[in-house]
Swiss-Prot record:
Natural source organism: Aequidens tetramerus
Cofactor(s) required for function per UniProt: heme b
Keywords noted in UniProt: Electron transport, Heme, Iron, Membrane, Metal-binding, Mitochondrion, Mitochondrion inner membrane, Respiratory chain, Transmembrane, Transmembrane helix, Transport, Ubiquinone
Subunit structure: The cytochrome bc1 complex contains 3 respiratory subunits (MT-CYB, CYC1 and UQCRFS1), 2 core proteins (UQCRC1 and UQCRC2) and probably 6 low-molecular weight proteins.
Disulfide bonds: none
UniProt function note: Component of the ubiquinol-cytochrome c reductase complex (complex III or cytochrome b-c1 complex) that is part of the mitochondrial respiratory chain. The b-c1 complex mediates electron transfer from ubiquinol to cytochrome c. Contributes to the generation of a proton gradient across the mitochondrial membrane that is then used for ATP synthesis.
Binding site for heme b b562: 83, 182
GO biological process, one term: mitochondrial electron transport, ubiquinol to cytochrome c
Name of the gene encoding the protein in the UniProt record: mt-cyb
Mitochondrion as UniProt keyword: yes
Protein name: Cytochrome b
Amino acid sequence: MASLRKTHPLLKIANDALVDLPAPSNISVWWNFGSLLGLCLAAQILTGLFLAMHYTSDITTAFSSVAHICRDVNYGWLIRNMHANGASFFFICIYLHIGRGLYYGSYLYKETWNVGVVLLLLVMMTAFVGYVLPWGQMSFWGATVITNLLSAVPYIGNSLVQWLWGGFSVDNATLTRFFAFHFLLPFIIAAMTMIHLIFLHETGSTNPAGLNSDAEKISFHPYFSYEDLLGFAMLLVALIALALFTPNLLGDPDNFTPANPLVTPPHIKPEWYFLFAYAILRSIPNKLGGVLALLFSILILMLVPILHTSKLRALTFRPLTQCLFWLLVADVMILTWIGGMPVEHPFIIIGQIASILYFTIFLFLLPTAGLAENKIFT
């Protein structure tokens, strides 16, 4: 008789995704980040739920409610630190996951890739509205600066900003709706993750060689389920270590000051995981141009499958494109550094060069290198 996990309508779905899933035998630790992102999402939803039980989304009490969570709620300080630093780990995993996809040609599964880009945008949006909730100085001014970018939209810009704010400035209405968005979006992300997985399981996973692995498949459980568990353990140890030893390492000191609309912080900057995009935004002197560059810096990922020119899938056997890939990684790191620097010489010009290089690599250098390698190989 067939086992229940193979016949039960619900268990069958879980079985096909987590137990009897055929996986390539040679996938490396770079294929662990999908499951780690699932763990991050679960941890964020769980800690966020407990924070929401004690948080108040009103400008008079928001800041002190966070202080109350840290001081008076049992293990509130731990839940808050896990949630704040969990966001950083979420983005570390997401960037490594995207980097893996770019390196090994996973983007050729177009549906999976495009759903992934939408997921990235949703996660970025969730992190942004979440950063506003503690109602510190950087929360308030970050919200003011970033939402103000919508005013660059021709004709309807100002109306759009006031509609988003719910008034003529970032105020109580803004905080309340941002809390609503921050509560809702993770569940939409969870649903989109399911769609991401459905598309992935239509084709199966890629592998480090970039070759067809149909002849050499092994079951997901126990081989990769245990490998994933090791990843879970390492991620949780790192997260708990950060949350316990240096919980404010990645935060901004300005956020220890309650929001004050009358005092602007000397350097307004987002959390570290948005700095590369912020640097691209700032590197263009025109407001609308900057906003478009900011949007395109993420949406350019959707063009990667279209711009794939090589006959080979992965970069494993493509030394020229490998160099460009690592140049891109270095460039994103430089942009991240520049995004956290004041707008003055020499940071302005470095940011502009790095921004131009970022788009040039994606739109011109990678496709050209692919064509050149085709010539070399034939």
